[in-house]
Amino acid sequence: ILVLPGDGIGPEITAATLSVLETADRKFGLGLRIESADIGLKALQAQGTTLPEAVMARVPEVDGVILGPVSHYDYPSREKGGINPSGELRVKFNLYANIRPCLSRPELSILRKPMDLVVVRENTEGFYSDRNMFAGSGEFMPDPDLALSVRKISAAASERVARAAFRLARGRRCRVTAVHKANVLKLSDGLFLREVRKVAAEFPD
C-alpha cells in the first residue's frame, strides 16, 4: 500500500488510517506492506513538483493507494510544478467510480434507524474543470455580477458508473437509487438517467 500524506491535515488523517490498517494487519495477519512518498507542497519544495514522476510510476505497481487531502489552490502554475495530485491520478488511472460507504456502528448512538448504504458517484465528469475541460477552468463571467459554469455529462461515463453501482448492489441488497434532477436538467441529467435505466434492464434481480 502506497501512502501519499498530502498537505494540511493530510498527514494527520493518513496516520490515523494507518493505525487502523496496522491493527487489522496484526489481528488478521494480512501481511500488509506499507510505503510512503511525498506529494504536494513538501514534494514541491524538495523536488520542484507537487507530483513527482516516481510517484506516478509507483502507483500501478502497488495494490492500493491512500491519498491524503491536498492544498492544490495553494500550488503554483503547472509550468512551475503545481499539479493537482488527486485530479492527475483520477485521469491517469481512470478512477471513474467514487465509492463512499455509509455505515452506522451498533456501539454508537444514532438519531435515526441504522444506516447501511453506499454512494457511488461518477468521478470523471461534472462541473470541475479537471474533469470536463482539456484547458481552461470551465467557468465564465460575462460581467462582474454573472458567473456561468460548464457541466459535462456523457453517455459512456454514465453507463459505466451505473454498471459499477448495479454490480455492487448485486452483492448487497439488490437495490439501486439513481439520484438526479432530470425533471429540470432534462438534457444532462436526462442523459444520465437514460443510461442508468438501460443498465438497470440488464440487472432484473
Please describe what each predicted stretch is.
Residues 27-53:
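N-terminal beta-loop-helix "entrance" segment that forms/cooperates
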Residues 30, 115, 203-205:
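A short helix-to-beta-strand connector/capping loop
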Residues 6-8, 39, 70, 104, ...:
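Short, ordered loop/turn segments at secondary-structure junctions
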Residues 2-25, 139-205:
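Glycine-rich phosphate/diphosphate-binding loop of Rossmann-like nucleotide-binding domains
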Residues 44-140, 146-148:
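N-terminal glycine-rich phosphate/adenylate-binding segment common to multiple enzyme folds
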Residues 31, 65, 175:
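Residue-level detector of anion-binding/catalytic polar loops
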Residues 6-10, 40, 68, 126, ...:
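Glycine-centered flexibility sites
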Residues 33-37, 100, 177:
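General small-molecule cofactor/ligand-binding pocket signal
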